[in-house]
Amino acid sequence: MSACINGLCRAVTVSLLLLLLSFSFSSACSNGNCQLLDSCSSATDCVSGLYCGDCPAVGRSKPVCTRGQATSPTSIINGLPFNKYTWLMTHNAFSNANAPLLPGVERITFYNQEDTITNQLQNGVRGLMLDMYDFNNDIWLCHSLRGQCFNFTAFQPAINILREVEAFLSQNPTEIVTIIIEDYVHRPKGLSTLFANAGLDKYWFPVSKMPRKGEDWPTVTDMVQENHRLLVFTSVAAKEDEEGVAYQWRYMVENESGDPGVKRGSCPNRKESQPLNSKSSSLFLMNYFPTYPVEKDACKEHSAPLAEMVGTCLKSGGNRMPNFLAVNFYMRSDGGGVFEILDRMNGPVLCGCETLSACQPGAAYGSCKNVTVQTRTPSMDSTAGSNSGGSYSGSVQFSRSLASVAQLNNIVVFCFSLLPLLIFLL
């Protein structure tokens, strides 16, 4: 028997695919007048919220205006329980290809994002995945292995990024941020002390108020009124009692990350997680990123394949929409990207409409505005797919080219392939 109710899984998948497959047009415009998928040559060509980018992976030969910001769902439909919304989350949010190197050290690790935490938050990211380690007598953000941070896998002290989060919450008093920690911190009270020193304890959502049996979370309105606007989860169960940091898989289900999480037609649960259709946890984290991050492919991944996977995971979750969508290189797409998909995930749940932009504040559930979908055709050529380059500018300035960052990750793949031999020799 299908887990879908009234064909919701099929309807969501089909609407996502139709919208994303229809994104394609090229026209002459400039001076901030260019709309989504119009041809562009610089950041100033596109209207606010769009940037100028291309996607050779789908055969696009020229840059077009590409969506670069999420629509806040609470700005349209407010006052529902926190677990009714879907939020954008960045995988390894700290692993920024443009992050400064440590003095005298060449970093050897994978990169998953291309801009700062502050930029991510300003562009609508509301969930951050952070890997925290004991390093240099402090707690650092590292993209490492075997539970140990090295100088060539280290990025920066964790408090630096947490202070960016504090500044954002302070300046945006109605916003809620979630942090998920891959936790390799062993010092006593390390996490609780770290967050207090960053000034984030005043926003802390207490574990005692988190639903443990699959009930609804408090409404976003109540969370804002009580200033419980920071949710923090750890991968270490003992820290819930020791430090008051919630154990992640006690409160959410999660699909498998890496390549198993992007395999078409399959959405298995992560081994630490309960089954995705479990009723004992009211949050659902959907991972969608390959094991090895490849920048030039991200724009293609964030189109029809992701839209289809949302439908697959919706069905695996017992007709429950994911609450967090975690991706690499969140800005890269062939048009609407993860931002359009988020709208398509929020719309049916929040207001019964195909997309968030069709929702009408204060109207009855299912009362939707007519939304015009662009159906345009971009400039294409037969050789564009072989081009590994890319140009990106706009609300987020990428200071490295796509090709140079891809080369870094390819070098890391080679280095990590030699690691077992090096460990054996040592």
Swiss-Prot record:
Disulfide bonds: none
Domain PI-PLC X-box: 76-232
BP-aspect Gene Ontology terms: lipid metabolic process
InterPro entries: PI-PLC_domain, PLC-like_Pdiesterase_TIM-brl
Residue numbers covered by the propeptide annotation in the UniProt entry: 405-426
CDD domains reported in the protein's UniProt record: PI-PLCc_At5g67130_like (cd08588)
UniProt membrane topology term: Lipid-anchor; GPI-anchor
Any single GO CC term annotated in Swiss-Prot or TrEMBL for this entry: plastid
An MF annotation (GO) of this entry: phosphoric diester hydrolase activity
Compartments (UniProt record): Cell membrane
Residues carrying covalently attached carbohydrate according to the record: N151, N255, N370
Superkingdom per UniProt: Eukaryota
First and last residue of the signal peptide: 1-28
UniProtKB keywords: Cell membrane, Glycoprotein, GPI-anchor, Lipoprotein, Membrane, Signal
Lipidation positions, renumbered (GPI-anchor amidated serine): S404
Region: Disordered, residue numbers: 258-277
PANTHER family documented for this protein: PLC-LIKE PHOSPHODIESTERASE (PTHR13593:SF140), PTHR13593
Name this polypeptide is given: PI-PLC X domain-containing protein At5g67130
The species this protein was found in: Arabidopsis thaliana (Mouse-ear cress)
Lineage: Eukaryota, Viridiplantae, Streptophyta, Embryophyta, Tracheophyta
